Amino acid sequence: MSHGWGYADHNGPQKWCENFPIANGPRQSPIDIQTKGASYDDTLKPLKLKYDPTTSLDILNNGHSFQVTFADDNDSSMLTEGPISGKYRLKQFHFHWGASDGKGSEHTVDGKCYPAELHLVHWNTKYASFGEAANKPDGLAVVGVFLQIGEDNPKLQKILDAMDAIKSKGKQTSFTNFDPTCLLPKSLEYWTYPGSLTTPPLYESVTWIVCKQPISVSSEQMKKFRSLLFTAEEEKACCMVNNYRPPQPLKDRKVCASFK
């Protein structure tokens, strides 16, 4: 993005409203999910996620996170049902994480932070492209998955092995034959609410689907995330850590739960 936003004091979340006034809008993300305030909704369907590993293309350090991009020119990697109607295609996934294991997730649950959070970003195929869908109220659906410190997660290994090739901003390498289904928790019980992108331009276009059950990551694996750099090769190195936006006010929104 232009405007040079980031996560430092001079360009971080507290300053985003200067260039992106929607930062103070009515449906901003992330939020603190207060479990007592979330209402069970028996009309919410189970999530249906069908991903085709041949659609994964490449992995990129964009100077804010790293993302794995997918071919989205047909319906082979899709999210349907859950809280959404219609079909949403997978565009990319990325993570947010902290400088230490005590924080790093964007969403929190009853004030509890996790060390990292995975976001799988999908766009509504009633629009012609991701770009067209990105600012529409029903344009995007993002599945959020918390990472919790525990056992080494072998499912993350292929991603971690690619990190050395994308250490600095602007680096990209091919990343093929990957099925992100392997990154989902066993239980797909979720909370859902209307929200926004958590990075500029902060469009209020996201149906958030936050999985209740976290996946495992070891402290050693988290160190690999933190080995990436916010900076390009020729710049003074700055470690990619704390690339998360803090929780935003819930305002007039309701959080629904797919489970009792």
From Swiss-Prot:
PROSITE patterns assigned to the protein according to its UniProt record, in alphabetical order: ALPHA_CA_1, ALPHA_CA_2
EC number: 4.2.1.1
Binding residues annotated for Zn(2+), in chain numbering: H94, H96, H119
GO terms under biological process: carbon dioxide transport; regulation of pH
Chief location of this protein within or outside the cell: cytoplasm
One example GO MF annotation: zinc ion binding
Subcellular location: Cytoplasm
Pfam families: Carb_anhydrase
Gene Ontology CC annotations of this record: cytoplasm; plasma membrane
Transmembrane intervals: none
Enzyme class: lyase
SUPFAM superfamilies from the UniProt entry: Carbonic anhydrase
InterPro entries given in the database record: CA_dom, CA_dom_sf, Carbonic_anhydrase_a-class, Carbonic_anhydrase_a-class_CS
Family: Belongs to the alpha-carbonic anhydrase family.
Protein name according to UniProt: Carbonic anhydrase 2
